Amino acid sequence: MHEFQFVVFSNPVAGREAEYNRWYQEQHLPDVVKVPGVVSAQRFQLADNSTMAHRYLALYEIRTDNIEAVMQDIYGRVGTAEMPMSDALDIEGVAMHVFAATGPKVCK
């Protein structure tokens, strides 16, 4: 079984941050975690004053021997009843990347 991180950078539509945060935390993360192979999801907000293009980050931990199949499953659910999207998400500005673990997790 291989480990991956699906990394998603995003922003809300101007003036709709509360709606975006509510949808992302209460609807979207639980929907993505229902996909077989996705074992956890967590969101982060930019904590410093840097001028990054994105203010929000979502990390999805995936364990699978077939990352292409898991990603195809995720993308296939987007916009369906299994994974409804919110128009409070600035979809044009979303950046998504999949990273494969290069070694074991180091913990304290």
Residue ranges and their predicted role:
Residues M1-K108:
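Macromolecular interaction modules
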